[in-house]
Amino acid sequence: AALRAGSPRRLILAPGNYGLDYLHEKMPALKNIPVVKTSNFIGDTMDMAAASHFEEVVLVGHIGKLVKLAGGIMNTHSRTADCRTELLCAHAALCGASRDVCAALMNAATTDACMEILDEAEMREPVLSSLLDAIQLHLDRRAAGAFRVGAVLFSNQYGPLGQTRTAKELLDEWKNG
């Protein structure tokens, strides 16, 4: 269905098994869209999607991987660049977080722990909104006009966390035909 003549060429990218599992469990309406498991190579996979003339791409992944996109990091392996807590802290600071909240974020061991800290500070929504805007910016830069792209973030502990502006648009279009 995603590759039929006359329809936009659509693709879902999932950085790992968590993303694949989330797609099957929480987004069954998208089962006819081709899915590529990217591993840590999100930027390279986006480049291949452009070379293959896909027109619409949605990344679906765990916040622990996709938060790195907010910093323009397109190879998400922890040996290449980690900075999950640093990016969460930076966006929390932009949203008015206290020094104590920022310190707690910097010392958190996981992104789920960061979500707990943000919940306690009643800052999860604005911080995720800021992160999603930054992710959208970096995805658009990497796609360089070759295709529309967005991202869906989730946590195994907290479930759906949000989606970028373009992901929302694309998913609405995909569900409606």
Positions of the model-derived regions?
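N-terminal loops that bind phosphate or other acidic moieties
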Residues: 1-55, 65-66, 70-177
